[in-house]
Amino acid sequence: MKALHFGAGNIGRGFIGKLLADAQAELTFADVNQTVLDLLNSRKSYQVHVVGEQARVEQVNNVSAVNSGSEEAVALIAEADIVTTAVGPQILAKIAGTIAKGLSKRHQQGNSQPLNIIACENMVRGTSQLKQHVFDVLPQEDQAWALQHVGFVDSAVDRIVPPAEAGSSDPLEVTVETFSEWIVDQTQFKGQPPAIAGMELTDNLMAFVERKLFTLNTGHAITAYLGQQAGLQTIRDAILDPKIRQVVKGAMEESGAVLIKRYGFDAAKHAAYIDKILSRFENPYLHDDVERVGRQPLRKLSAGDRLIKPLLGTLEYGLPHANLIQGIAAAMSYRSEQDPQAKELVELLAKLGPKAALAQISGLPAESEVVEQAVAVYNAMQK
């Protein structure tokens, strides 16, 4: 199995790339970081530190790397069996051109073997969005062929991969938690889905996408925002604070009530899933900074993301949402000199006031009760 993975960052190396390599794929990473590309090509291997109860170091071997925009990447797409990404939602549009060129070349070369493309991003149906970007630039004469031979497979991914410790001098070394989950939509494959240990197939992907978004992502973000408000440094420090933990767990229970109503999840199993996530946040071996986890507050406060989407579900089903409101107010309070969206958030709040700013960012009606509630909590937080 030939695999090309876009994104040689921590998630690419520590999660998706590792699973592909473990499945004996002939794996090439595509990235723009020349230092990482050169090191991967000279060493052909790297180490993954899995931390938790059963800490271990695992070696990933037989890897190579190319520049994301290069002709080599295009040529690899023409030959690959699977293409995956972990580049971040904003970058999908930037790699679409390379993928489109690769598909055109594949068509020209008469390669009618099925190719499956899987975007492994923190977003809902990311591969469907990547497909749209690819088809925007794919020549007309290749489109019908691509629809027939190329599967764009949506997925849900979950593994906490914090940035490397400052003390590590090796740019390729990566630290990951023991837990990982990669769930793919089996209805979207062309040909047989590849056998990759750790990749689970489902025909009800949205249930798992929303379960992860409404629980892990919602909880992680609220922990970060409340942690920053309390002057705490890491996710672990924040979740060990009883007041913060109460709100975070409460918010995950509120969003969980939506999931149980919408998808029929078992209530006891979902409660256990929430407890599992709380214990992941407590992992003493993961030094996950609240400022990093809180980054991009405008995206995280948008209508389809981890704070507003579960809130909309509570409104749809007439369910409580007091803790989600606390999380939204804390997100409005997020500040970071390093994050352009945090600066833009401050400007919007100053220019429009909290009510109009939240309405603009989230799509919620400015006069709605939930906006009034969130603004009241936000104002109280500023005192």
UniProtKB/Swiss-Prot annotation:
Keywords: NAD, Oxidoreductase. NAD(+) binds at residues 3-14. The lineage of its organism: Bacteria, Pseudomonadati, Pseudomonadota, Gammaproteobacteria, Enterobacterales. Belongs to the mannitol dehydrogenase family. One of its GO terms (molecular function) is mannitol-1-phosphate 5-dehydrogenase activity. This is Mannitol-1-phosphate 5-dehydrogenase. SUPFAM superfamilies: 6-phosphogluconate dehydrogenase C-terminal domain-like, NAD(P)-binding Rossmann-fold domains. One of its GO terms (cellular component) is cytosol. Its EC number is 1.1.1.17. GO terms for biological process: mannitol catabolic process.
